Amino acid sequence: MVSLISIVSVVFLLFTTFYHFGEARIINVGGSLDAWKVPESPNHSLNHWAESVRFQVGDALLFKYDSKIDSVLQVTKENYEKCNTQKPLEEHKDGYTTVKLDVSGPYYFISGAPSGNCAKGEKVTVVVQSPNHPKPGPAAVTPTLPPKPSTTPAAPAPAPPTPSPKSSTSTMAPAPAPAKSSAVGLVAGNGIFWASTLVAVIGLAFA
């Protein structure tokens, strides 16, 4: 017979696996399928886009490009800054490249096009947050102090006129007695319940 501990362990493992699959995403580099190219202007650089995205462990980057004239190279930080296409960490030339982000930290990608696309801005740095990295909280809001009250004292209100005493002739009627039907019904219902329970216990004892 399978132990309860084994069943619980398998259920927990399956839950954890499906949870991480649900969190993982496939992200188009640059925000669209045709963004892996020389940017139109510095304001549209791939790094500007990457800074606006929160990358997590398990995500995947999708590069789409013309494999006849371009490629994707994953390089070191030094080669990234120099646009050095020699000895990359990984080289992709299939035109539809998916790169899995398995660990946290920075990833550096440059274009391998011989026309020098990297120097023209076709490169991107992706920083993957650690699983325990806290999410940014909301900006602090400075409380607004209420305006100070006016120091000029207000004039006192005139005293109300004193009403003339009148003799009260009306008498208050006594409150009616509360109804007893609901309480009686509750007591009767409890009596029936306990009587039935007692009969059932006696029947089981002599069965």
UniProtKB/Swiss-Prot annotation:
Keywords: Cell membrane, Disulfide bond, Glycoprotein, GPI-anchor, Lipoprotein, Membrane, Signal. Residues 129-179 are annotated as: Disordered. Pfam families: Cu_bind_like. Residues 1-24 form the signal peptide. It is a lipid-anchor; GPI-anchor. Residues 144-164 have a biased composition (Pro residues). It comes from the Eukaryota. GO terms for cellular component: plasma membrane; side of membrane. Disulfide bonds join 83-118. Residues 182-207 form a propeptide. The keyword Transmembrane does not apply. GO terms for molecular function: electron transfer activity. The keyword Plastid does not apply. Residues 25-130 form the Phytocyanin domain. It is found in: Cell membrane. May act as a carbohydrate transporter. Required, together with ENODL11, ENODL12, ENODL13, ENODL14 and ENODL15, for male-female communication and pollen tube reception and burst at the synergid cell surface of the female gametophyte. This is Early nodulin-like protein 11. The lineage of its organism: Eukaryota, Viridiplantae, Streptophyta, Embryophyta, Tracheophyta.
